[in-house]
Design a protein with these regions (language model features):
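Conserved short histidine dyad/triad with adjacent acidic residue
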Residues: 22-23, 36-53
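A cytosolic small-molecule/anion-sensing beta-strand core signal
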Residues: 62-63, 78-79, 97
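Ligand-binding loop in jelly-roll beta-barrel domains
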Residues: 87-110
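A short, N-terminal "cap"/entry segment at the start of jelly-roll beta-barrel domains
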Residues: 1-34, 69
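Glycine- and acidic-residue-biased ligand/ion/polar-headgroup-sensing regions
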Residues: 55-67, 71
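Structural motif
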Residues: 65-67, 74, 90, 100
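Short acidic-glycine-tyrosine-enriched beta hairpin
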Residues: 72-87
Length: 110
């Protein structure tokens, strides 16, 4: 089930999460044992350090620019671009400039 978002209404997702000075902010809009969908905003120079996920994690940039590192390879993404970070592989995110993204993580059936 979705939460924190109005159903049956057209949305601009980048407007559903706000920038906060010197912070990473998030808003979970769906979560269960199979999938997690979260909106994020990063102020410039904020980051999430390297970590691994149990599921494949797809990032789509909604605004701004991010550097995403996957297994020591760097990618710079801008608005409208998407990348999938494979499960079990270290990845990190850094705000080259302030940016917003939607993160969809799909977990394996166990």
């Amino acid at each position: 089930m979705f939460k924190n978002i109005t159903l049956s209404e057209i949305k601009q997702l980048e407007n559903e999460v706000s920038y906060q000075p010197n912070q990473v902010s998030s808003k979970t809009i769906a979560q269960n044992k199979y999938v997690s969908i979260t909106l994020f905003s990063f102020d410039k120079d904020e980051e999430i350090s390297a970590h691994k996920s149990k599921g494949d994690a797809m990032v789509t940039i909604l605004d701004g620019k991010s550097k995403i590192t996957i297994d020591d390879k760097e990618y710079v993404l801008s608005k409208g671009e998407t990348i999938v970070m494979p499960a079990g592989i270290p990845h990190a995110l850094f705000a080259v400039e302030k940016f917003k993204m939607i993160l969809t993580v799909v977990f394996p059936n166990e």
